[in-house]
Amino acid sequence: MAVNGVPLGTQDNLFCITGGEGTGKSNYVGAILAGALGNKRLPIEKTLGLEITANPKDLAVLHYDTEQSEAQLHKNLGKTLRRASLTAVPKFYHSLYLASLSRKDRLKLIRESMDLFHHKHGGIHLVVIDGIADLIRSANDETESIAIVDELYRLAGIYNTCIICVLHFVPNGIKLRGHIGSELQRKAAGILSIEKDDNPEYSVVKALKVRDGSPLDVPMMLFGWDKEEDMHVYRGEKSKEDKEKRKTDELIGVVKEAFRNSFKLTYQELCEVLMREMEIK
């Protein structure tokens, strides 16, 4: 997965999508899945601005959902197929409903089914876990958060695939919330945040982290509902002025965080806070 040639989600890695309720995360995930179902790359208009690597070898594409009802999952599947211009569910695509299982059993099923479908289809092209926080008891439990992110990172390496983790939290500026957010911030190769645009008819997608590059190299992308198409469609990129405003707003947020507990900082203390907040090593 890439935007304008900047890689976001790659093999052996985790890729995180985060955002609040009603921002269109599930529809965005559906667009990514649609791009992974065909043997030729879909145009970015179909995949809401993302460049998704096609799947000519029909490797397994796995979608685990902990959030939605079975009826909603089925409805979203229909939209994904329509977006991919398919009339039937490919044999290599498996969408699994996890909401009815206990949290412990959800991870067990993910582990076992990944192994099963890897052998059945000769490999795994893509995995999506919609609702990673629902695999543990609390998103603020440090031990559990470290364990689940480490385990998913391990599975991505074993099966040489990209695992997309969807986190249903609103980020705090450029930081993800909770211990699970902190772990994903450290381990994920890329993080995209989806939020409502100033124009409420649109959602805006922003890069919070890009391992091989800068988040500011990734344009802010827009998508919105189209009545005639009966699905979300790509609405292009935000302007250069909006990009500059975003940069300014994020820097203001970092400075506010730096001075949250003190009105005065030494130069060394300020450098340490800025390096920590902006993950500069």
Predicted features, each with a name:
Residues C16-I17, G22, N27, L126, ...:
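Phosphate-binding/switch region of NTP-binding enzymes
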Residues M1-T80:
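The Walker A/P-loop phosphate-binding site
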Residues A31-I32, Q72-T80, L109-S113, A147-E151, ...:
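Alpha-helical scaffold elements adjacent to nucleotide-binding pockets in ATP/GTP-utilizing enzyme cores
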Residues G38, D115-H119, G157:
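Residue-level signal for alpha-helix termini/capping positions
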Residues D12, K57-L59, G122-G123, Y159, ...:
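Structured loop/turn residues at beta-strand edges in well-structured enzyme cores
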Residues I44, T53-N140, D226, D249:
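Conserved inter-motif catalytic segment of the P-loop NTP-binding fold
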Residues D58, K120-G123, D197-K281:
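C-terminal regions of RecA-like/P-loop NTPase motor modules
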Residues S69, L73, R106, E144-E151, ...:
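Helical mechanochemical/support elements of P-loop NTPase systems and associated helical scaffolds
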